[in-house]
């Protein structure tokens, strides 16, 4: 397998084509963004940490029967993945109130949400990822009703698997986002799962162990990411 041309450069990852039309190389960079990409900084080791973290989580989800785009780890910062036709809508599962939900509804941060909330957002930085629903998806043709139902089912299944994984490590999985795509007609989990796209709190102290440390200028971003990785069993070095 040979890495070829750059296909897409996102806020924290770069995607490359390969000599296999069905496979891509995903490179995790040290960039960290907030405010829909308006604020970007670099942190040493972040690309490596997120790459290995994501590979670990995707492997756990695959073991649980959730189809993922993951093929294999290539290097400290690169992974080989299936080329998906991405759905332009992201799924968010919320176990506790935080972030935009608190701002939108004026509820207390940390409120337990039982059953968990399932939200949909259109992936559009210029419009600040507006919240949408199943009706929008059907009307605008973003994803079929059947595929959307599958995305919801897989998101909630991932929540069960990961909530237990983090709980066993002394962490609360507050919320997280997932992105899906189609591979040969099948819904497959793509993009990444890392502390960049999830909220993780320490069970005892409620300390934030995710990208909110960057968003809220709390400091210690990489130290928090590495601590979460260590607790769940990710081998970094």
Swiss-Prot record:
Main enzyme class: ligase
Pfam families in the cross-refs: SAICAR_synt
Keywords of this entry: ATP-binding, Ligase, Nucleotide-binding, Purine biosynthesis
InterPro entries recorded: SAICAR_synt/ADE2_N, SAICAR_synt_PurC, SAICAR_synth, SAICAR_synthetase, SAICAR_synthetase_CS
Pathway membership: Purine metabolism; IMP biosynthesis via de novo pathway; 5-amino-1-(5-phospho-D-ribosyl)imidazole-4-carboxamide from 5-amino-1-(5-phospho-D-ribosyl)imidazole-4-carboxylate: step 1/2
Reaction(s) catalysed by this chain's protein: 5-amino-1-(5-phospho-D-ribosyl)imidazole-4-carboxylate + L-aspartate + ATP = (2S)-2-[5-amino-1-(5-phospho-beta-D-ribosyl)imidazole-4-carboxamido]succinate + ADP + phosphate + 2 H(+)
Disulfide-bond pairs as recorded: none
EC code(s) of this entry: 6.3.2.6
Entry keyword annotation includes Lipid biosynthesis: no
GO cellular component term of the entry, any: cytosol
Flavoprotein found in the keyword field: no
PANTHER family: MULTIFUNCTIONAL PROTEIN ADE2 (PTHR43599), SI:DKEY-6E2.2 (PTHR43599:SF3)
Protein name: Phosphoribosylaminoimidazole-succinocarboxamide synthase
Organism for this UniProt entry: Photorhabdus laumondii subsp. laumondii (strain DSM 15139 / CIP 105565 / TT01) (Photorhabdus luminescens subsp. laumondii)
Upper lineage: Bacteria, Pseudomonadati, Pseudomonadota, Gammaproteobacteria, Enterobacterales
């Amino acid at each position: 397998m040979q890495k070829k041309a750059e296909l897409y450069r996102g806020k924290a990852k770069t995607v490359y084509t390969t000599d296999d039309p069905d496979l891509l190389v995903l490179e995790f960079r040290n960039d960290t963004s907030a405010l829909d990409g308006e604020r970007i900084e670099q942190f040493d080791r972040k690309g490596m940490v997120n790459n290995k973290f994501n590979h670990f989580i995707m492997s756990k989800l695959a073991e649980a029967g959730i189809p993922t785009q993951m093929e294999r780890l290539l290097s400290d910062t690169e992974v080989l993945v299936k080329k998906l036709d991405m759905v332009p809508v992201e799924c968010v599962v919320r176990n506790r109130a935080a972030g935009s939900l608190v701002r939108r509804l004026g509820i207390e941060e940390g409120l337990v949400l039982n059953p968990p909330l399932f939200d949909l957002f259109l992936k559009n930085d210029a419009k600040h990822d507006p919240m949408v629903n199943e009706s929008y998806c059907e009307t605008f043709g973003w994803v079929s009703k059947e595929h959307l139902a599958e995305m919801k089912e897989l998101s909630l299944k991932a929540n069960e698997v990961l909530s237990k994984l983090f709980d066993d490590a002394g962490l609360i999985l507050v919320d997280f986002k997932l992105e899906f795509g189609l591979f040969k007609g099948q819904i497959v989990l793509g993009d990444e799962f890392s502390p960049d796209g999830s909220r993780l709190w320490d069970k005892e102290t409620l300390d934030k162990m995710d990208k909110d440390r960057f968003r809220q200028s709390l400091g210690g971003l990489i130290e928090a990411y590495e601590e979460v990785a260590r607790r769940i069993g990710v081998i970094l070095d």
